[in-house]
Amino acid sequence: LALVLLSACSTSSPFKSLTAGPCSGEQKQLVSAHISSQISAISKQDWPLAYSFAAKSFQDSVDIFSFEVVITGSYPMLINNQGISFGKCEIKATSIFQEVTVNSGSEKSELLYKLTSVDQKLGVEAANIIEQSSALTT
């Protein structure tokens, strides 16, 4: 596993130069893995790890305590998630936008993640709730 991680770091970054339009397959895979890792840390309430996936610009303006307060207050579906799926991934200017559906049992939430790549390192800048709906139960 360490060899795979090391070899992944040594290759040229798929985020070196961003071109507007749909994400490439490799970009989508890396973005999905980054968001999945952050959501996994959030669901375990491992705030230092979850915070480490945030963009440096986000970390410069929001401290870890405020990050935890925002997540627990506005994004409880990330803590209680029972699965996530990924929709469209698109690049606009210097940002990467990824649609994410979070299933938290009786509720599904559509979020739009905004990521940036600084020095070829991905970071989550924002996650906005687009839509929340209750699952129909019969």
What is the predicted function of each stretch?
Residues 15-19:
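N-terminal, intrinsically disordered, polar/charged segments of Gram-positive cell-envelope systems
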Residues 10-12:
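Bacterial signal peptide processing site
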Residues 1-2:
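Sec-dependent N-terminal signal peptides
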Residues 6-8:
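C-terminal motif of bacterial Sec signal peptides marking the signal peptidase cleavage site
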Residues 83-138:
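Exposed beta-sheet edge and beta->alpha loop/turn motif
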